[in-house]
Amino acid sequence: MERLKGKKQIEKLFVSGRSVGVFPLRLVFLKTEETNKVGVSVSKKNFKSAVNRNKIKRLLRIAVENHFLDLFNKLKPKYYMMVLYVGKEIPKAEELDTQFKLMVSRFNKKVLDEV
């Protein structure tokens, strides 16, 4: 699993991508010909302190590794994905994990409906 980097790729994702949301998370995804790439983002507007933003990003990356790794191996079309944290409080790891599972199941439904 690679990190989503580069202004053009991220811009393309937000302009043409689709999204799935489960508060406090939102997943924006776009089918692509390249490899699966994932990025995480936390709003500077909601979390002024870089320490808090980085803590949440760390939790998000762990959740991505735990829940998307199996899914990526099964997915035939490749995707660019961005996981956004839109909440206003620092989450507990267990709560984030539960919400992430729900978001992954909604993503699966949306992708399967597409095919």
Where are these regions (language model features)?
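Positively charged, solvent-exposed patches that mediate nucleic-acid binding
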Residues: 1-115
